[in-house]
UniProtKB/Swiss-Prot annotation:
It comes from Finegoldia magna (strain ATCC 29328 / DSM 20472 / WAL 2508) (Peptostreptococcus magnus). Signal peptide: none annotated. Belongs to the NAD kinase family. This is NAD kinase. The keyword Coiled coil does not apply.
Amino acid sequence: MNNNSKIINIYVNDNQKSLETALIVKDKLEQKGFKPTFDFDENALINLCIGGDGAFLRAVHKYEFSTIPFVGINTGHLGFYQEILIPNIDKFISDLINENYGIEKISLLESKTAIRNSSKTYTHKALNEFVVKSDDSSIVYLDVYIDDNHLESFAGDGIIVSTPSGSTAYNFSAGGSVLYHGLDGFQVTPLAPINSKAYRSLLNSLVVPSKSNVTLYFRDHNFDRKSSIVLADGLNRSYDNVDYVNFTYSDQYINKLVFLKDWYWLNIKDKFL
């Protein structure tokens, strides 16, 4: 973190409330001697995201998983990543000036998508989760391997592979477990699994260590359709004739500013209970 920098990168959602908040924050920062910019500057002190969790995720991807610490002002609904509330903007700026914060390292997942009968592979990263499914809402058939061990022949709507940070997002809505954000592992969660004599699919999520290697092989049933979809934090990637998708922990990570020591438990209670 470049503590000598006065530059603040601002990423803002395009709704009216977020845009108005961004202008207010920009003015307040300038009054305190900061240099806010709506462009990305690699020498910035922080990346400030204004919006909801979607804005935070889009900023992380747009800034290519920069190690400049991210922090969010919440103008959305859930705001799990967005720690700063609009009434607390002045306190946020004061804490920033006085360095009253911690920095948390957040792990990323990496996927490699291989195309059948081709040497082509596509690599992506995700902060929250990857989702593998068909492009037309039909059943997807997958052989699931953990560290080269065959676990199951899955049939269903798809599979979510999520980080601890992402466990409170789509994974949670799909019936997956909430993993403490500091846990060293990730989660594999089925979407509408079929469990019958013909198909034996796990009905619940599976938590694996961070060193694990998870691979989803597309079975021959899938190749009568054209495309399959691999979603990275909601960003749609469509591929023809996928052979397999492999998931591992990434060597990259992002940093997040933390102003409240117990922010995680406060978030869990505030957002879900």
